Every structure is written in C-alpha cells, then in structure tokens.
C-alpha cells in the first residue's frame, strides 16, 4: 500500500477536501462527480480521468487570491506539476495574465450562482504551453457548518493551442 508521504492526496486534509469536492458537485449538479466504487473516494477522485482542481475561499480580489487546495492526477499531468508544487500555489497562476480577468469573472459568477456549467477558457502549463479548456463545470465547496469555503472545477474537454 502507498504511504501518505508518497500519496499526499491520502492525508486527512486531502481526504476531507476530496469529500467536499464530491459532495459540493453532487449538491450543485444533482449527480455524482465520479461513479461510485468500493475504493476510497479520495483515491478514486485522484485517479479519475476527468481533470479536477479546487481552491480555498480567499477573496478573488484579496492579494494573490485563492490558493489551490487540490489537484488530481489528471490536473497534475496537464499542468506538468507535482502535487507539492501545484497545491498551495495561487490558482490564478493556472492561467496566463491575459486570461485572468475572464477567469475571475467566471469564478465570481460561479460563486454568486453556486455553480456554472459550460465554461471555456485558455490555461497555461508549467512550461508556458497554452491549452483550451471547454465545457468546464465550476461549483462552490461547503464546510461542515454550511459555509462556502472554496470552489472546484472539472473538465475533460481540452486541447493544446
């Protein structure tokens, strides 16, 4: 079995975040994010083919804004970053500067409506390569007290530019 040091997505904090991501998605879209399985949710979400990311609840206009709190294996591969580098970085760094205004507008809309579907935008990987995401879904994350504590996004439709 993989140790938590080798599998940071299996730490108690990451497991709780995976549960918030999955429950927030189900609440927002009235269906599960990933198919139910006998494996632990945190492992299944990390291994999912769909790209899944989440950031904390810092204000979009506060300093560097929200920081990533989760990225599954598909996200890590797409952005070309390891967990330790991706998780904790400002989420705005997933997009190039020219795209950050439209990204921030979509996040604000999703925050106001609790969820949106059909978002498209251009992102940038670690090496500066640009890629288009299409039909992304964005939703609010909720803590145990029912307060908004971040946002998540998923998509499977993307291509290099």
Features from the language model and the residues they span:
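Sensory/regulatory domains in signal-transduction proteins
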Residues: 46-161
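Acidic, metal-coordinating catalytic segment for phosphate/diphosphate chemistry
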Residues: 34-42
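Short, low-complexity N-terminal regulatory "tails/caps" that precede and couple sensory modules
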Residues: 1-33
């Amino acid at each position: 079995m993989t140790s938590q040091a080798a599998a940071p997505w299996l730490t108690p904090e990451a497991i709780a975040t995976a549960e918030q991501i999955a429950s927030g998605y189900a609440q927002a879209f009235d269906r599960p994010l990933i198919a139910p399985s006998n494996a632990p949710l945190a492992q299944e979400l990390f291994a999912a083919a769909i790209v899944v990311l989440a950031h904390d609840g810092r204000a979009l206009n506060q300093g560097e804004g929200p920081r990533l709190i989760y990225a599954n294996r598909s996200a890590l591969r797409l952005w070309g970053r390891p967990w330790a580098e991706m998780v904790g970085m400002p989420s705005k760094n997933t997009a190039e500067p020219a795209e950050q205004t439209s990204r921030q507008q979509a996040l604000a809309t999703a925050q106001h409506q609790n969820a949106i579907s059909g978002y498209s935008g251009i992102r940038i990987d670690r090496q500066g390569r640009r890629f288009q995401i299409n039909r992304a879904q964005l939703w609010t994350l909720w803590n145990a007290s029912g307060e908004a504590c971040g946002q998540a996004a998923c998509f499977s439709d993307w291509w290099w530019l």
